[in-house]
Regions:
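Cytosolic regulatory regions of ion transport systems
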Residues: 1-187
Length: 187
């Protein structure tokens, strides 16, 4: 995490100019965190179906480039009216996995290049991946990766859970005097 900006810099990805307009469906804590973490050059439209929650979003979303819309993010007419065809990214972050999957499919069909679906029902992850709806996030899998990282008590830089393959991949930082330095992987 402390080298993320450095890596972005040397990779030429300090910013993501290809993503400037983002639609977020759902007004839960994940949506709030995402909207508040966006850089200034990104504009977000958060669509929330619950009126009271939409009002609350106006208080907790501090990003001045975020607009709160009270409506149904599955309503294609609303999406068209709000300019979905000009969006480069669509994040479906409701508490309903099925809704998120279908919304991302609709966004893809409307021309959005990058879609993210929060899929909390682990039974749907494989199906969602096969539909090619974009990136799939699962809080349980994400949390499990971090718990696993803490349990190992090693100098691990990254742990990823591959839900479809039922596997974990860990990236370790190896000290310069370790026995495995300068050896072939096969050894």
């Amino acid at each position: 995490p402390k080298y993320v900006n450095y890596i972005r810099d040397i990779a030429g990805k300090e910013e993501y100019p290809d993503v400037s307009n983002v639609f977020i469906m759902g007004g839960g804590s994940s949506a709030v965190h995402l909207a508040n973490a966006m850089p200034d050059y990104m504009h977000a439209k958060i669509i929330e179906s619950d009126g009271r929650r939409a009002e609350r979003l106006n208080e907790v979303v501090t990003n001045r480039h975020a607009m709160i819309i009270h409506g149904d993010g599955r309503d294609l007419a609303l999406l068209e009216e709000e300019g979905i065809r000009k969006a480069q990214a669509f994040c479906a972050l409701t508490e309903n996995s099925e809704t998120n999957i279908l919304a991302c499919l609709a966004a893809k069909r409307l021309g959005v290049r990058k879609t993210v679906a929060m899929v909390e029902n682990t039974d749907y992850i494989g199906m969602a991946e096969s539909l090619d709806i974009g990136t799939i996030i699962n809080k349980k899998t994400f949390a499990a990766s971090h718990i696993y990282q803490m349990m190992l008590k090693a100098d691990i830089t990254s742990v990823k859970s591959l839900t479809v393959a039922n596997a974990d991949v860990a990236e370790f930082s190896v000290p310069a005097d370790a026995k495995i330095i300068h050896k072939a992987v096969k050894d």
